[in-house]
Amino acid sequence: RLSDAKGKMRIVLMDLVARRRTAAAAPALGKAADDADPAVRAAALAGLGAVIETAYLPKLTARLATTKDAKEAAALDKALQDVCLRSQDREAAAARLAATMPAADGPVKVRILETLNIVGGAKSLETVAAAARSDNKELRDAAFRVLGKWKSVDAAPILLDLHNNVDDKRFKIRAIRAYIRIARQFDMPAERRAAMCRTALKTAARDADKRLVLEVLLRYPSNEMQAIALEAAKTPALKDEAMLVVIGMAGKGINRAELGKALAQAGHKPVKLEIVKAGYGAGKKTKDVTKILRQYAKNRRIIFLPSASYNVSFGGDPAPNIVKQLKIKYRINGKEGEVSLNENATIVLPIPK
């Protein structure tokens, strides 16, 4: 029996009842969660996450408010997640978890928001959105951070509304960038993605954010996306990048005759491009990819590799598990330039000054 077990056998039995989801073991697990041994407490909390129902959530959040042990706090977070994710009614589970927020202190509220992101659903999103509109600066910051990594397209209209109605410039930027992230990463009908791209281009205040939209257009080429890129090209600061996106769509089901007319009307001219040297990697773990890059460099400032992955295009990963960059030295029309690009970024070479 779990209630009579001692030492390592107690931990083994707690793991067993968790695997079997033995609800009757909840009282013994609850008692073990107060044990002096950190290993016993951690095993007990993991077990509680596997067997208790959502009615127990307030006790877990109350415990989260009092613990000073980082590992125990992480175990409590996991238990909260497990309880909600096991629930047959996740909306009801999210509602119960959200109901614990008013009584929680600031740090616990932040952790609850993170858990709601994992649980997902309408109630979770509603709760996080409300936090993003609150007067509490810490809570707002956490809510915007959570919305920035939300796991469904449902957050898009909320992010747009937040962008349009918050006063803080930093939050406006985070909202529109999160909105663009949804357009870039999630499955959705082509019409909706195109509409989101149009909206983002009209709404974003900074050219840097509008350029993120251009990357979305290039990732999902279509006649509609081409039309959006051509519209963006009317903005002087975006003209070059937008036209390069149009070029990048060539050969992917786009009407080539219309593409040629559009490029001629835009006055986009080819350049004389030379790749002087190119290296890919991080620090000393860098490989020379000059010859490979030269194979794909044409007479445009955008270079299209055979794969969206630099590792695939350049024949391997020179620095596994490390953030890498592609550094290129080049000449355009005889003028020397240099650019550093984050891993897998679209290769667009700036005009040298």
Go through the PLM ranges and name each one.
Residues 26, 57, 90-94, 125, ...:
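Core helices of alpha-solenoid repeat scaffolds
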Residues 87, 180-181, 186, 253, ...:
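Mid-chain, structured segments of secreted extracytoplasmic proteins
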Residues 92-99, 192-200, 258-263:
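Alpha-helical repeat scaffolds
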Residues 269-353:
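Extracellular, modular beta-sheet/disulfide-rich ectodomains of secreted and cell-surface proteins
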